[in-house]
Each structure stands twice: as structure tokens, then as C-alpha cells.
Curated annotation (Swiss-Prot):
Keyword Heme: yes
Cofactor note as given: Binds 2 heme b groups non-covalently.
Keyword Iron annotated: yes
Lineage: Eukaryota, Metazoa, Placozoa, Uniplacotomia, Trichoplacea
Quaternary structure, from the entry: The main subunits of complex b-c1 are: cytochrome b, cytochrome c1 and the Rieske protein.
Gene3D superfamilies (UniProt xref): Cytochrome Bc1 Complex, Chain C
Binding site for heme b b562: H80, H179
Organism: Trichoplax adhaerens
Residue stretches spanning the membrane: 30-50, 74-96, 109-129, 175-195, 221-241, 289-309, 320-340, 345-365
Gene coding for it: mt:Cyt-b
Name of this chain's protein: Cytochrome b
Length: 383
């Protein structure tokens, strides 16, 4: 079978012939795994939307109907719900690899990637509201109410988002429409991400530009991607059929129908938002917390500016590598603090220390370590 195509399929040739560094590892597989996750989420989401009812009196029962009465509906629901967790696991590994190996040197590719991450978080949040359980309702109420921290116009924006004076049927309809639309926006951004990647090509673990030591993407790296696909599909099968895993990542409160008159014992988002939620809670001021929440994501956009080292990869930089693993540990600590009871010690103190280190790493340590790295590089070059 001839691999190279003509006409509308001509872009496939760019994938087949893409010059790829020969020394990239399995950490570079997560990009293709994310494409597979996005495809599975869109497919299962479209099938679920055929049976879902975006009405406050029917939403919860329609989800129960999907699980109980629709053929293989329970697989669709749990693959879609837990697939979001797998999606974010792959995203965080992909971002971590980019930070470790200096992928932000491809500035436009990095910016589009951060935008994809932001849209992903928005899509996941509004999707969490759709089952209309207790945590869905109160999570939507608390998180959307944060917009009221904007001076002067915050209250009006919140009412515009809600479509009224509280989270109601209008809110659910809007969130369902956006949750159906945004994945296709993500597809467009992913295509833009790939197009920008093809301009300069992928980076490599050494963090240096090498135009000679490259191989075509097919067949050397498609085989590695296929192996990753098989492993990921195996995980999807397990989370779809194993009862003890299906609901492991689901909040028990969300199996209770939403009741505006009963507040849950704790209100928290899904685990992949907990690090940002902990940063939000660590700032006593409401507006400051909201700004810190958005800054925790948008600070990634500054990485191409903050890191001015000549060799971006941390492979041969033991000091920067040491602090990188500190920020990884800090991410897990923030995730843990986000799930802890609000306003209780020592969680408040730990959360504030972890928040300071989170921003300190990006805004202080990264520029400082880059400057020191350049000094050592120039010193070794002159001796």
C-alpha cells in the first residue's frame, strides 16, 4: 500500500516524512496519546449526548437511565468520566516533559499548547456540572461565583453566566451547549499545535539543535506510538469494566441529586483541578485568589521569556533538575491540600508555603538558574 497521498490527503505526507530526532524517548509519546484520548472523549460524548437531557428536573435521572437502560451505556459513562482523568494525567506528563526538556523554545507551539490546556480545563469544569449531582450543582455555584470578585461588573457577569440569579435550568443548558462545542474547538487548536510543531520539528532530550541526526516519523516512531495506544486502550478497557475502578475517581456526593437547600460537607472540584483550587484558597483576599488561580496556569506562557539559558534541557543541569523535581512534588502537595478541609491548620499554612514555592519556581528560580547556567557555559567555553 502506497503511504504517500495526493489531493485532500496530502497533509498525511508531512506526518510520514516529519524529520524527528532519533534520540527522543517514550516521554514524547504523550502527545499522540492525548490525540487518542480526545478522540475517545468526543466519540463517547456524542453518544452520551443522544440520551442526555439538559433539564434540571431530568438531567440526573437521564444519567441514571443511560447507566441502567441504554445498551452498554454504563461503559460509555465511565469511559467518558474516567477518560477525563486519563486525559489530564497525559496532559500533566506532556507539560512536565515540556518543562524538563525545554519544549517552550518552540514559542508558538508552546503558546497554542497552553491555550489547549486552558480550554481543556474549562471544558472539563462545565462537563462536571452536567450530571446534576450535589457536587455538580454546588461546584458550579462556588466556582462561577468567583467571577463576582471582578470590581464593578463581576456581579453582572455572574448573572449573565447563570442566566438568572442562581444556577438554574438556563445555566445547565448553556453548559451543555458549550461542553458539546468546545471539544471541536480543541480539535482545531490541536491541528494548529501540530502545524506549528512542523515548522521547527520536535526538540530532543539534549536540548540542542541537530538537523543531521534525524529519522522520518514513519515507521520508527509510529511503532512506539502504537505500543502506547495499546497500553492506553488497555487502561480504558479496565476502567470501563472493573466495578471497583469505575467509581474510584467519582465523588460520592455526586451520586445524590442536586438539592439547593442542602450544602455538602465539602465542596471541591475534580482531582485535576485541586492544585489550582489550593492556590485559590491560600490567598485570603477573594480577588487575589481568583487572580492567583488564573496566574497558576498563565504563568506557563511566560516560560519562553523567563528561561534564557542557552541549553534549555535539564538533562545536564543537576541543580535545575533538583528544583524541577521539587516543583513536581509541590504540585502533588497542592493537589493534596486542595482536597483537605478548608480553613483548618496545618493545611492553610502548608498551602500558602506550597503556593509561594509554585510561583517562586517559575518567576524567580527559572530565570536565576538560566542565568547561572549561561555563566557556567561561557566559563567552560573560555577555559
Amino acid at each position: 500500500m502506497r503511504l504517500r497521498k495526493t489531493g485532500l490527503l496530502a497533509p498525511v505526507n508531512d506526518i510520514i516524512d516529519l524529520p524527528t530526532p532519533s534520540n527522543i524517548s517514550y516521554w514524547w509519546n504523550f502527545g499522540s496519546l492525548l490525540g487518542l484520548c480526545l478522540g475517545i472523549q468526543i466519540l463517547t460524548g456524542v453518544l452520551l449526548a443522544m440520551h442526555y437531557r439538559s433539564d434540571v428536573s431530568l438531567a440526573f435521572s437521564s444519567v441514571a437511565h443511560i447507566v441502567r437502560d441504554v445498551n452498554y451505556g454504563w461503559i460509555l459513562r465511565y469511559v467518558h468520566a474516567n477518560g477525563a482523568s486519563l486525559f489530564f494525567i497525559c496532559v500533566y506528563c506532556h507539560i512536565g516533559r515540556g518543562l524538563y526538556y525545554g519544549s517552550y523554545s518552540r514559542v508558538l507551539t508552546w503558546i497554542v499548547g497552553v491555550l489547549i490546556y486552558f480550554i481543556m480545563m474549562l471544558t472539563a469544569f462545565i462537563g462536571y456540572v452536567l450530571p446534576w449531582g450535589q457536587m455538580s450543582f454546588w461546584g458550579a455555584t462556588v466556582i462561577t461565583n468567583l467571577v463576582s470578585a471582578i470590581p464593578s461588573v463581576g456581579g453582572s457577569i455572574v448573572e449573565w453566566i447563570w442566566g438568572g440569579f442562581s444556577v438554574s435550568n438556563c445555566t445547565l443548558n448553556r453548559f451543555f451547549s458549550l461542553h458539546y462545542l468546545l471539544p471541536f474547538v480543541l480539535v482545531g487548536l490541536v491541528l494548529a499545535h501540530l502545524l506549528t510543531l512542523h515548522e521547527k520539528g520536535a526538540n530532543n532530550p539534549l536540548g540542542v539543535v541537530s538537523l543531521s541526526d534525524r529519522s522520518t516519523f514513519h515507521v520508527y516512531f509510529t511503532i512506539k506510538d502504537i505500543l502506547g495506544f495499546l497500553i492506553l486502550l488497555g487502561v480504558f478497557v479496565i476502567i470501563g469494566i472493573e466495578p471497583r475502578i469505575e467509581t474510584l475517581l467519582q465523588d460520592p456526593e455526586n451520586f445524590i441529586q442536586a438539592n439547593p437547600l442542602v450544602t455538602p460537607v465539602h465542596i471541591q472540584p475534580e482531582w485535576y483541578f485541586l492544585f489550582a483550587y489550593a492556590i485559590l484558597r491560600s490567598i485570603p483576599n477573594k480577588l487575589g485568589g481568583v487572580l492567583a488561580l488564573f496566574a497558576s496556569i498563565l504563568v506557563l506562557l511566560l516560560m519562553p521569556i523567563l528561561d534564557r539559558s542557552k541549553i534549555r534541557s535539564l538533562t545536564f543541569n543537576p541543580v535545575a533538575k533538583f528544583f524541577f523535581w521539587f516543583i513536581v512534588g509541590d504540585f502533588f502537595i497542592l493537589t493534596w491540600i486542595g482536597s483537605a478541609p478548608a480553613g483548618t491548620e496545618p493545611y492553610v499554612l502548608i498551602g500558602r508555603i506550597a503556593t509561594i514555592f509554585y510561583f517562586g519556581y517559575f518567576l524567580v528560580l527559572v530565570p536565576l538558574l538560566g542565568y547561572l547556567s549561561n555563566l557556567f557555559y561561557e566559563y567552560n567555553g573560555t577555559t
